[in-house]
A protein has these predicted regions:
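Recognition helix of helix-turn-helix/homeodomain-like DNA-binding domains
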Residues: 31-47, 113-131
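DNA major-groove recognition helix of helix-turn-helix
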Residues: 15, 41, 51, 59, ...
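DNA major-groove recognition helix of helix-turn-helix/homeodomain DNA-binding modules
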Residues: 50-65, 133-150
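A short, Lys/Arg-rich alpha-helix, primarily the initiator
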Residues: 1-20, 73-106, 110
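Short C-terminal boundary/hinge segments that cap the last helix of small helical domains
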Residues: 60-79, 145-162
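The alpha-helix within a helix-turn-helix
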Residues: 27, 56, 108-110, 141
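Central "turn" residue of the DNA-binding helix-turn-helix
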Residues: 31, 60, 102, 113-114, ...
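Helix-turn-helix DNA-binding elements, focusing on the entry/boundary residues of the two helices
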Residues: 22-23, 49-52, 104-105, 137
Length: 168
C-alpha cells in the first residue's frame, strides 16, 4: 500500500471520528480545498510535504502519522509546527553517512535512478529548495528498504541506538 492510500485511509478515519460526511466538511476541517481533497481521493494528485505538515498542524498530530498505516492521528500533540522537509533532510544525511556515501553521485545511486543527482541536490538546497511529493517519497523509501513514513519521522536518541544489554 503506497503512502497516498494510507493518507486517504487516515483522512477517512478522521472524517468518521469527527462525523464529517461530505467533501466540503472534510476539506474545511483539514483547511484544504474540496478540489485538492477530490484529487487525492481519486489519486490524480498527491499532497506535498508542506501540505502534509499544514494538515498535521491543523489536526495536532505528527506529519509522519498521516502516512503511517493506522498512524496515531488522534495523538493531539503540542508542537509549534511540523517540518517534514527538515526531518527528511536530517534522516537522509544520517543514512548517507551510515552507508558511507559522500559524493552526490554516490548518494543518488542509492535510489536506483528514481531520484536524479540534480533533483537530490535541489532537496538539500538552503533556499529555493524543492520537496519531493509523496509518490517520490514512496520510491525513495522503497529504494532504501524503509517504510515511507520513516523518512519524515524524527528519531529520538534512544530509538537510534539500542542501549539494552540483553535483548531477550
Amino acid at each position: 500500500m503506497d503512502s497516498l492510500d494510507i493518507f486517504i485511509n487516515n483522512i477517512n478515519r478522521l472524517a468518521i471520528a469527527h462525523n464529517l460526511n461530505t467533501y466540503r466538511k472534510i476539506a474545511n476541517f483539514l483547511n484544504v480545498t474540496e478540489d485538492s481533497l477530490k484529487h487525492w481521493q481519486s489519486k490524480t494528485r498527491c499532497p506535498s510535504l508542506k501540505r502534509l505538515d499544514q494538515i498535521s498542524d491543523k489536526i495536532g498530530c505528527w506529519s509522519y502519522a498521516l502516512i503511517q498505516k493506522d498512524g496515531d492521528i488522534f495523538a493531539e500533540i503540542e508542537l509549534l509546527r511540523n517540518n517534514s522537509r527538515k526531518i527528511l533532510i536530517k534522516n537522509l544525511k544520517e543514512y548517507f553517512l551510515q552507508e558511507g556515501r559522500f559524493s552526490w553521485n554516490d548518494k543518488a545511486a542509492l535510489f536506483y535512478g528514481f531520484v536524479s543527482e540534480d533533483a537530490l541536490k535541489s532537496y538539500f538546497r538552503k533556499e529555493n529548495f524543492k520537496t519531493p511529493p509523496l509518490k517520490k517519497l514512496d520510491e525513495m523509501a522503497s529504494a532504501l528498504g524503509k517504510p515511507t513514513y520513516e523518512l519524515i519521522k524524527e528519531v529520538e536518541l534512544n530509538e537510534k541506538t539500542d542501549t539494552r544489554k540483553n535483548k531477550e
